[in-house]
A protein has these predicted regions:
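Low-complexity, Ser/Thr/Pro/Gly-enriched N-terminal "stalk/linker" regions
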Residues: 1-63
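Residues at structural and domain junctions
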Residues: 2, 16, 42, 54, ...
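An acidic intrinsically disordered interaction segment
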Residues: 18-42, 99-111, 188-207
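Acidic/His metal-coordination segments adjacent to aromatic residues that form catalytic metal sites
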Residues: 45-53, 112-130, 192-227
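Surface-exposed loop/turn and secondary-structure junction residues enriched for glycine/proline
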Residues: 55, 60, 64-65, 69, ...
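Aromatic-rich carbohydrate-recognition surfaces in CAZymes
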Residues: 58-86, 90-191
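Residue-level detector of conserved catalytic or cofactor/ligand-binding positions
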Residues: 230-242
Length: 242
């Protein structure tokens, strides 16, 4: 399995094998996990972007796709192939952000596939449209880490700049969720954690207090308190503060 990986990743695996030679079970687990993402979830698209499905679902989550490939940043500095693969993911993420910043998961093609027929403004690109702050934070963090690890800047293109403006506009809008937000989400015949109350608007929140609203947690479960910082993951909280 590891023989199919780029040389830079094979070197990293060899280093792990040497360092943890006394624990072959752990080494085997690492090799399987480290190679599985590239083998089964990553696809280079004809337009030069990279699509990363979750593995168990044929769709790409903005947040999850970052977490899946972030370990490969270690090799990106010395491996152009890996660097290009990751840059392709960044460009695809910001294409999706600009298409719909309220969506959390996207199809590989514009085919209309979806998790469920939810009551929200869907398009054929969208697999699911649960609005989560994390979905917008992670692509920004990933673009930064790619630059930090490789020094490349070509992914900071017009699409990226447009995406940053899109993200900021959404966060500003969602500071006044009740008055300004166009977003709503309802799923019929499901658990309460998979839908928003008040005809898809979520629990009533107070506007203008400096907090930005989120409909769902990183777990894809609905927020009970849309302005609560407690549900936001630590990396996301730090990204928002910075």
């Amino acid at each position: 399995m590891k023989e199919n990986l780029p040389v830079s990743l094979q070197k990293l695996i060899h280093k792990v094998e040497e360092t943890f030679a006394e624990d072959p079970a752990m080494v085997e687990l690492f090799i399987n996990c480290f190679s599985n993402t590239l083998d089964t979830t990553v696809k280079k698209m004809e337009d030069g972007t990279t699509h990363v499905i979750t593995g168990d679902i044929p769709a790409m989550w903005l947040r999850d796709s970052v977490a899946q490939v972030r370990p490969y940043l270690v090799a990106a500095a010395e491996d152009q192939e890996i660097s290009d693969l990751l840059a392709g993911l960044s460009r695809r993420q910001f294409f999706f952000v600009n298409h719909d910043p309220y969506a959390n998961a996207f199809n590989q093609e514009e085919n209309g596939n979806c998790w469920d027929h939810d009551e929200t403004e869907m398009s054929d690109w969208l697999w699911e449209r649960k609005y989560e702050i994390d979905s917008l934070c992670y692509p920004v963090q990933f673009a930064y880490l790619l630059w930090k690890n490789t020094g490349r800047t070509d992914h900071f293109d017009d699409n990226f700049v447009k995406g940053l403006h899109t993200i900021l506009n959404v966060w500003k809008t969602e500071q006044y969720h009740e008055e300004k937000s166009p977003y709503s989400f309802q799923c019929k015949g499901c658990y309460c954690t998979d839908t928003l109350s008040r005809e898809g608007k979520g629990a009533l929140v107070k506007s203008g207090v400096g907090l930005t609203w989120s409909g769902f947690r990183p777990s894809d479960d609905a927020c009970i308190y849309g302005l609560s910082l407690i549900h936001i993951s630590e990396p996301t909280r730090l990204q928002l503060i910075s």
